[in-house]
A protein has these predicted regions:
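Motif- and composition-driven signal specific to adenylation
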Residues: 1-165, 170-179
Length: 183
């Protein structure tokens, strides 16, 4: 619900299914009666083949690491006019750089870009933020967003005490998406 995922979307399925990021493509796609557009590893690894294949997929949703988007951005034809139905990008698993965000917004002005955070044990995206021109203008590093409603995140020191804002510590995630066995 957080991402307004439309029914029947064509969804890029690029991450290997052993990578927790893949949950962000196949679960919403299946729940919304969408179609997974699987990208074979050999296609993803061969830029010429990748650049030729992407426009044929008629994508609506893009789920990947930011570095995979950086590869796609090497193709000058990776833009809204060539991918008119591509309405949203979802990133997790790596840092989304300001440069990547700027390039995507410039090339896909009608698309929504979401930066998310969430480790494997917390079932991937426990935070998210729409990346807009204002977010880019006001941040040197792209923020990971706000905690979803059913989750709590706190930062603790080595003794389990809460730390002051801006102080280093361990990220503690509490909520129903945290896998069993994690404390």
């Amino acid at each position: 619900d957080d991402f307004a995922w439309e029914s029947g979307s064509n969804v890029l399925s690029q991450p290997p299914y052993s990578f927790d990021l893949s949950v962000m493509d196949w679960v919403p796609a299946l729940l919304s009666h969408g179609t997974l557009k699987a990208l074979p590893k050999q296609t993803a690894d061969d830029f010429k083949s990748l650049f030729k294949t992407l426009p044929t997929l008629n994508l609506h949703k893009w789920v990947s690491t930011p570095s995979f988007a950086d590869v796609a951005l090497l193709d000058p034809e990776f833009k809204q006019s060539v991918h008119p139905n591509l309405s949203a990008f979802f990133f997790c698993g790596e840092v989304l750089t300001k440069t990547t965000a700027e390039k995507l917004l410039a090339r896909f002005p009608d698309a929504h870009i979401y930066n998310t955070y969430g480790p494997t044990e917390a079932t991937v995206a426990v935070t998210s933020i729409p990346i807009t021109q204002a977010v880019i203008a006001n941040n040197n590093k792209m923020p990971i967003g706000y905690v979803k409603a059913d989750t709590e995140i706190v930062i603790q020191d080595a003794d389990g005490e809460m730390v002051a804002d801006g102080e280093p510590g361990e990220i503690i995630i509490v909520g129903p998406s945290v896998s069993r066995g994690y404390l």
